[in-house]
Amino acid sequence: MAIHKIRAFFNLEASGGIVLALAAIAAMIIANTSLNTWYESFIHAPVAIQIGSFSIAKDAHHWINDGLMAVFFFLVGLELKREVLIGELSNVKQIILPAGAALGGMVMPAIVYLFFNYNEPEFWRGWAIPTATDIAFALGILSLLGNRVPNSLKVFLVSIAIFDDIGAIIIIALFYTNDLSLGSLAIAGLCLPFLYMLNRRNVTSITPYLLIGVIMWIAVLKSGIHATLAGVVLALFIPLFDRTDPEHSPLEELEHDLQNTVSYGILPLFAFANAGISLKGAGFGELFHSVPLGIAAGLFIGKQVGVMLMCWLIFKLGISTMPKGMNFKQIYGAALLCGVGFTMSLFIGGLAFAGETPLFDERLGIIMGSIVSGIAGYMMLKTTLKDEVNVTSVDLTRHS
């Protein structure tokens, strides 16, 4: 029966990654065919919310990236908080490892990019493009491996990506934002003591947290900083335990409620809205311009070298230890996946070279570096992870 096949597919651990990949492939095909006009109309369709004199007007693309993706980052923040309190990151030393790896994974790509452009000072402002990691696509690729992935590896990659995104947001605020609104940031900051008070008073109803979270999200959005940061911050205040009922965990209930919505709704929509890059008019020869070449090399070479070098140094100095159930080959696979810069790199590239005469196309370097990193990371992990339960090979025909 068809319904059984569909149910069996969605029971696969890898199904979320498969749906994400299909959405990205569909977008790339559509954007480079005659359907591109429809695609552009869809992602740039104006959507506005107005209450009295207050209004937020964005196109669909921005609502997906700034709004829906804040929900994804909220879920990631919930998972991260749980791991810090009772999971893989409950030891402070284990937090140092992904934080250091993220730092190395940002510094080295910038160095590689500047090496390729050391004779071109006018292109130095693109140094931050290869420092980014697209957490959604990196985790999507990881999920293709199903439940062979140890939880420690997923937490390690998520932690690196979170620190990386925070670093990217700081870089954007310091180097690429001309109209930062301190007033809006102050409003966002004022939300924090209220969230803290709710947590300390053991308020387990999610509604007041979400109401304050929406206010904080709007303030961060208006400030000029990437609004998804509000999702991570809000997650930190959701109580893990109900002090009056130890069996009740508001945080874990939220995780469970959001998982399918994010995996099969938000992330595929995000992939579809961001992967549709039209390459019409872009020559392959442009890839060898110092800017796209430096970006591609920064993502593929710089990321893996930076992450691995910092991990090796941290282990060598005894600052932290190898996460349980992991080895250097798996860390290397995760380091490769960190080179999937994609959407955040595209965003920074648009800021760095806004209004630039098209002597080159930085998107080519981002796409090439991200694709090569993603494929290499997937292949590396596929060959190193133990196939304890090969969920990708479930026989979908057995229910027919």
From Swiss-Prot:
It comes from the Bacteria. Its main location: membrane. The keyword Ion transport applies. The chain crosses the membrane at residues 10-30, 60-80, 95-115, 126-146, 155-175, 178-198, 218-238, 265-285, 295-315, 334-354, 364-384. It is found in: Cell inner membrane. It catalyses: Na(+)(in) + 2 H(+)(out) = Na(+)(out) + 2 H(+)(in). It is a multi-pass membrane protein. Gene3D superfamilies: Na+/H+ antiporter like domain. One of its GO terms (molecular function) is sodium:proton antiporter activity. One of its GO terms (biological process) is regulation of pH. Keywords: Antiport, Cell inner membrane, Cell membrane, Ion transport, Membrane, Sodium, Sodium transport, Transmembrane, Transmembrane helix, Transport. Na(+)/H(+) antiporter that extrudes sodium in exchange for external protons. NCBIfam families: NhaA (TIGR00773), PRK09560.1 (NF007111), PRK09561.1 (NF007112). Belongs to the NhaA Na(+)/H(+) (TC 2.A.33) antiporter family. This is Na(+)/H(+) antiporter NhaA.
